[in-house]
Amino acid sequence: MTEELKLMGANRRDQLLLWLKESKSPLTGGELAKKANVSRQVIVQDISLLKAKNVPIIATSQGYVYMDAAAQQHQQAERIIACLHGPERTEEELQLIVDEGVTVKDVKIEHPVYGDLTAAIQVGTRKEVSHFIKKINSTNAAYLSQLTDGVHLHTLTAPDEHRIDQACQALEEAGILIKD
Amino acid sequence: MTEELKLMGANRRDQLLLWLKESKSPLTGGELAKKANVSRQVIVQDISLLKAKNVPIIATSQGYVYMDAAAQQHQQAERIIACLHGPERTEEELQLIVDEGVTVKDVKIEHPVYGDLTAAIQVGTRKEVSHFIKKINSTNAAYLSQLTDGVHLHTLTAPDEHRIDQACQALEEAGILIKD
């Protein structure tokens, strides 16, 4: 740690919040650690403290995002869908969805020990999809859906219901959507 | 599969919902599979379809639970807390909380690839805590908090704020609560 000024406690958390509010794209823990001149672990604890105060920060697969009311307002339509596919079709599935201008807010599976396990992946563009897939492949992380033989839920968000209808139709045609 | 009547599609889902609504305690996938005379995987898909219709079923660490309005009403107070401890203190932490009559609704950590990962463990008694810990040990599942060097969030629910205050005080005295 160089001798540059190290931001301390509450001031640091205020500054983190400011950076996140001003940023147009997600900020990773590493980027925030460098900016605040502290370790990545200190950032994880700081973000946890802010979340414990109900500050609307989410850790997405791309980094931390401040979800203010306006950002949430933009995504008025929301729908939960049930999907079934092998891990090799994850990228295809996500692309079918984002190509309709729809965001995949999360993926939910049933963990045999923990019960419902929800991951806030928050991918809405082809770039974010490929970044997410690359991260999975580079870290050898398992696809969560492998825990339940491919069955999983997604919460989809979009500016309107029509886009979600289109995404569901595309998934159905691809044999990915589980229908009643 | 014996030749007993196998419940089919939508009827089966209606029946699953009825069993869950009537049950005073969580029902496991295995129990529902036996009752409906189908495989466990069929039950996972059925529950996913019901969840996709916003039916308030959650998969907890103890099994499926139907969270009707009354059940949720009973738990009016809710608070997110930030905690830090090693995996060996998980049981102690959960006991400190449930001993105050407080329920641990979930555990949330930051997965390096998936972002926020939330597990609906839903433990509220010493019996449920020991069942959860036994399951982790018997399946060698890692504690989620091990992914973030012990830092994690819990959402606590209880009939009133006072019980949550007491639980937080106990956690603080044990050096588990991360404070501002």
Swiss-Prot record, chains A, B:
**Known Pfam families for this protein?**
3H, HTH_11
Q: Name one GO molecular function term.
A: small molecule binding
Keyword Heme among record annotations: no
The record ties this protein, via SUPFAM superfamilies, to: Putative transcriptional regulator TM1602, C-terminal domain (SSF75500), Winged helix' DNA-binding domain (SSF46785)
**What outcome is recorded for mutants in which this gene has been deleted?**
No visible phenotype when grown in the absence of nicotinic acid.
Q: Which domain of life is it from?
A: Bacteria
The protein's UniProt keywords, in alphabetical order, are:
DNA-binding, Repressor, Transcription, Transcription regulation
**Where, if anywhere, are coiled coils annotated?**
none
What the entry lists under InterPro entries is as follows: 3H_dom_sf, 3H_domain, HTH_11, NadR, WH-like_DNA-bd_sf, WH_DNA-bd_sf
Q: Which residues form the signal peptide?
A: none
| Subunit structure as annotated in this protein's UniProt entry | Homodimer.
Q: What role is this protein assigned?
A: In the presence of nicotinic acid represses transcription of the nadBCA and nifS-nadR operons. Also binds to DNA upstream of the niaP gene, probably regulating it as well. May bind nicotinic acid.
Task: Name it.
Answer: Transcription repressor NadR
Name of the encoding gene? nadR
